Structure formats: C-alpha cells, structure tokens
C-alpha cells in the first residue's frame, strides 16, 4: 500500500531535507524512524526539498509498504523514533497513482522576518532579522512585478538543477504584525529608533528554483530599506542574471508551508502551526 505523511520540522540542526552521506538530514532521520517502526527499509519521496536551516510546516512525503496500519498508528509509531525537532502530523492511505511531488498543483513558502534594533534571541534560527525600518508599500509594489509566469534566472542559485528557469508565481502576500513600518519623519533605512515588528512574506507558485525565495527576499528587503525603488525588481527580473539581484537572504526565517493538491486526494492543506507563525 502507499502512504502519505505530513511532516513538520525545525531545520536549524539539519543539512537540509535530502539524504546525504552522514545522515544529518531530515529525510535520513525520517526514513530511519519509519524503518524502525515498519521493520523494513523505507524510501520516501517528498513534495519539495528544503536547504540547510530551512524549516517545514507540512512537508508531504509518500512511501510504499506491505504493512497495513491505521493512519494514527503510523503517526504515533514513527514519532516514537524521531527527534523532538521532527514530527509526523498526519498519515493517509493513498492510491498508487498519488505522487507527493508530481501530484502537487502548487507549493507555498513563508518567510518570517523580525524588524528590530536588537537581534532575535528566543526566535534565533526561526526568523530572519533586519535592524532597519522597512517600507511595506514599497515591498508590495516590488513584489507585484514578480507575479505571473516569468524567467526567474536572476533569482536562481548557480547549483540549481531545474530544467527550466520559467516558473509561475501566483501569490505574494506581505503582512505585518506589530507597530513597525517606517515611523513618521524617518526615511527607510534610517538607523534611528526602529520599531519592533514581524513581517510575514508568503509565496505560492507552481514550483520554485533553488534559493529562489531567499533571493527574492534579498531584493524585497533591499527595496524595503530604500536601497532601490520598487520598479528595480522589474529590471532585475528582465536582466536574467544572478549578478543583477541582491545577495541571498538568510535561511533562518524560511518555512516550507507545504504543497497543494486536488481536493480529490483528501489530504490536509495546512497544520495548526500555520496560524502560529507571526
């Protein structure tokens, strides 16, 4: 039978999702736990790989097994053998036609950014950080240039293995929690009394290139700090050159929210942690 799992993890201690020699990845830990519970080797396929330090709210994987267990048995049994920073949230039996990657119609990411004159402490590793006030309207205007189908070469890592740089961004939402933003009489980028707040950037697209979200974040923050006007984003996109864009932003605040599937598969589209993020 084929089983799908929803997996959440804090990626701070791992070298990314994909299995590597040494076993210090989320996939290695998950497959080891599944093998101990199922008493046979298990090979998983995920909806979307994440880099070192990137977190997952609802990574979806599938695997094949001769065992027939109840969904919650897979959840509780696998979690028994997982470390505290990885947890299976749900399990569902699925038809053999289901494929965690190929069946996905979209993927979603969120970046949580702390704006504060003081670096994060309890949130360390779980949020990005800027100590300049950001202009939300400017960042939203810049983000609109990225919506739709484009060649995202300017936001692609040199090690990216995707066959094509052409992807479709369906949605970019930028929201703010707290009293931040640019105070009256203070220009973007001024290092005066920066109000503390959290910014949440949410991205939805058919697929993403390696480092694409982090490279977009670098550009959005540059615009938010007043280093470039909003229409600079269009110029970066049209340049089709990584050199045209801002440096890759920190992985700390990046979360893979999970894939979206046709409702006919009957899989959850989010976990409770979605509403926990600022």
Swiss-Prot record:
Formation of pseudouridine at positions 38, 39 and 40 in the anticodon stem and loop of transfer RNAs. GO terms for molecular function: RNA binding; tRNA pseudouridine(38-40) synthase activity. This is tRNA pseudouridine synthase A. It comes from Paracidovorax citrulli (strain AAC00-1). Belongs to the tRNA pseudouridine synthase TruA family. The keyword Disulfide bond does not apply. Keywords: Isomerase, tRNA processing. Homodimer. It catalyses: uridine(38/39/40) in tRNA = pseudouridine(38/39/40) in tRNA. Its EC number is 5.4.99.12. The active site is at residue 51. Gene3D superfamilies: Pseudouridine synthase I, catalytic domain, C-terminal subdomain (3.30.70.660), Pseudouridine synthase I, catalytic domain, N-terminal subdomain (3.30.70.580).
């Amino acid at each position: 039978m084929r089983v799908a799992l929803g997996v959440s993890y804090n990626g701070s201690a791992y070298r990314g999702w994909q299995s590597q020699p040494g076993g210090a990845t989320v996939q290695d830990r998950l497959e080891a736990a599944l093998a101990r519970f199922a008493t046979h080797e298990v090979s998983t396929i995920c909806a979307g790989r994440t880099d070192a330090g990137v977190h997952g709210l609802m990574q979806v994987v599938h695997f094949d097994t001769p065992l027939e267990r109840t969904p919650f048995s897979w959840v509780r049994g696998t979690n028994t053998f997982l470390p505290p920073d990885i947890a299976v949230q749900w399990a569902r039996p699925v038809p053999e036609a289901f494929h965690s990657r190929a069946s996905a119609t979209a993927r979603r990411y969120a970046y949580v950014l702390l704006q504060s004159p003081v670096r994060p402490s309890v949130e360390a590793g779980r949020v990005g950080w800027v100590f300049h006030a950001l202009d939300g309207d400017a960042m939203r205007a810049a983000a609109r240039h990225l919506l739709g189908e484009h060649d995202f070469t300017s936001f692609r890592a040199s090690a990216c293995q995707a066959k094509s740089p052409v992807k479709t961004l369906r949605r970019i939402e930028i929201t703010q929690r707290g009293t931040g933003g640019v105070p009256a009489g203070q220009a973007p980028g001024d290092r005066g009394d920066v109000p503390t707040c959290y910014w949440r950037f949410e991205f939805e697209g058919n697929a993403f290139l390696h480092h694409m979200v982090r490279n977009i974040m670098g550009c959005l923050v540059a615009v938010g700090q007043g280093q470039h006007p909003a229409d600079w984003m269009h110029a970066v996109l049209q340049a089709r050159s990584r050199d045209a864009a801002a440096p890759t932003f920190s992985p700390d605040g990046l979360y893979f929210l999970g894939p979206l599937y046709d409702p006919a598969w009957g899989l959850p589209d989010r976990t409770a942690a979605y509403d926990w993020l600022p």
